[in-house]
Swiss-Prot record:
GO annotation, biological process: CUT catabolic process; exonucleolytic trimming to generate mature 3'-end of 5.8S rRNA from tricistronic rRNA transcript (SSU-rRNA, 5.8S rRNA, LSU-rRNA); nuclear polyadenylation-dependent rRNA catabolic process; nuclear-transcribed mRNA catabolic process; poly(A)-dependent snoRNA 3'-end processing; RNA catabolic process; RNA processing; TRAMP-dependent tRNA surveillance pathway
Keyword line: Cytoplasm, Exosome, Nucleus, RNA-binding, rRNA processing
Similarity-based family: Belongs to the RRP40 family.
The encoding gene: RRP40
Protein name: Exosome complex component RRP40
Length: 240
């Protein structure tokens, strides 16, 4: 279901149905009332096997604003006595990553990250007047849940709308198109960053170029042809 919606509008989803909230939607912690906070197109996915729907607002914005439960990719830009300073987007405020925000972390057992390292994390706190905080584990289970340090691979900057489509829209074909050509690992950040890694560097480069071109053209019907051409060009250069 897709509906154009404004801030303050009623939320057109059955309140008795479990809903996973994405960007542009706020849940009042006191009343549990769900309401939109951005103007855009509301997308509500069909129920999955777990019976949970996913809802998010697709709105136009070039600046990323951290929101609780957002998946993000950050770059370590500084270290302090008890936390790391992380950049989520150029020319935007940094966020904080505690030394304890990792699986099984303790004062004696904590990860050692260097400036320039990439991390995949979840936004755990985001207050207007305070620095946002991220964590590299699932606080409900204590496990990494796919979060942590991103080693090797390539990082791609895309627009925020493209990242939201890739993460939330199950019908968005890009990942299936790439999977038809190679095996790969991917991390998608709602801050407009995508990390991709393949066993061979040539395939990683082909994935990088495919994602970049698909983001620029944003024509889902052309994704297959774009991927086919990019992988063919990389393979030709490799053979030469």
């Amino acid at each position: 279901m897709s509906t154009f919606i404004f801030p303050g509008d009623s939320f057109p989803v059955d309140p008795t149905t479990p809903v996973k909230l994405g960007p542009g939607i706020y849940c009042d912690p006191n009343t549990q009332e769900i309401r939109p906070v951005n103007t855009g197109v509301l997308h509500v996915s069909a129920k999955g096997k777990s019976g949970v729907q996913t809802a998010y607002i697709d709105y136009s914005s070039k600046r990323y604003i951290p929101s609780v439960n957002d998946f993000v990719i950050g770059v370590i830009i500084g270290t302090f006595s008890d936390s790391y300073k992380v950049s989520l987007q150029n020319f935007s405020s940094s966020v904080s990553l505690s030394y304890m925000a990792f699986p099984n972390a303790s004062k004696k057992n904590r990860p050692t990250l260097q400036v320039g390292d990439l991390v995949y994390a979840r936004v755990c706190t985001a207050e207007k007047e305070l620095e946002a905080e991220i964590e590299c584990f699932d606080s409900t289970t204590g496990r990494d849940a796919g979060f942590g340090i991103l080693e090797d691979g390539m990082i791609i900057d895309v627009n925020l709308n493209f990242a939201r489509q890739l993460l939330f829209n199950n019908d968005f074909p890009l990942l299936k198109v790439l999977a038809a050509h190679t095996k790969f690992e991917v991390a998608i950040g709602l801050n407009g960053k995508i990390w991709v890694k393949c066993e061979e560097l040539s395939n990683t480069l082909a994935c990088y170029r495919t994602i970049m071109e698909c983001c620029q053209k944003n024509d889902t019907a052309a994704f297959k042809d774009i991927a086919k051409r990019q992988f063919k060009e990389i393979l030709t250069v490799k053979e030469e």
